[in-house]
């Protein structure tokens, strides 16, 4: 039986991020049969522009890499801080690139929202990510 593959994404770009630390702990403590890959290239993604995401146009390499990692994973795990009562911009940018891709629609997504202010984002996220599990 093959291992369950989780792609873990921290919404924080800080070097000493507690969200990244939590995902690193998840990777270390994952039970046998669960493989966790921590995606560390959020800052390399270019700003999302729908004009750049058409079939005839090659995608930026960081976008292709992220989409391939999501496609190869059984689920996506996100840990993110709250910035200005919302999602961090770098994370929102990554989600925009992923939502534009058909491969993301079937991916289960687990996120942890620690602040009540972010709960207002759950409804639109649930529409964009039909398999979103809230922890």
Q: Where in the sequence are the language-model features?
A:
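Short, glycine-/small-residue-rich phosphate/pyrophosphate-handling segment
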Residues: 18, 107-135
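N-terminal beta1-alpha1-beta2 submodule of the flavodoxin-like/Rossmannoid cofactor-binding fold
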Residues: 1-80, 84-96
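Beta-hairpin (beta-strand-turn-beta-strand) motif
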Residues: 82-83, 100, 114-116
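Short, conserved loop/helix-junction motifs that constitute active-site signature segments
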Residues: 101-105
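Short, electropositive alpha-helical surface patch
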Residues: 91-100, 130-135
């Amino acid at each position: 039986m093959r291992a369950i593959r989780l792609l873990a994404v921290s919404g924080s770009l800080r070097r000493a991020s507690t969200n990244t630390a939590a995902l690193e702990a998840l990777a270390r403590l994952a039970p046998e049969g669960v493989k966790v890959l921590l995606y560390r290239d959020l800052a390399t993604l270019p700003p999302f522009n729908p004009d750049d995401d058409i079939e005839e146009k090659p995608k930026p390499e960081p976008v292709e890499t992220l989409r391939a990692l999501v496609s190869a994973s059984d689920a996506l795990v996100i840990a993110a801080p709250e910035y200005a009562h919302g999602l961090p911009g770098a994370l929102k940018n990554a989600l925009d690139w992923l939502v534009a891709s058909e491969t993301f629609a079937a991916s289960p997504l687990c996120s942890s929202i620690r602040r009540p202010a972010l709960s207002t984002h759950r409804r639109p996220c649930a529409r964009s990510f039909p398999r979103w599990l809230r922890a």
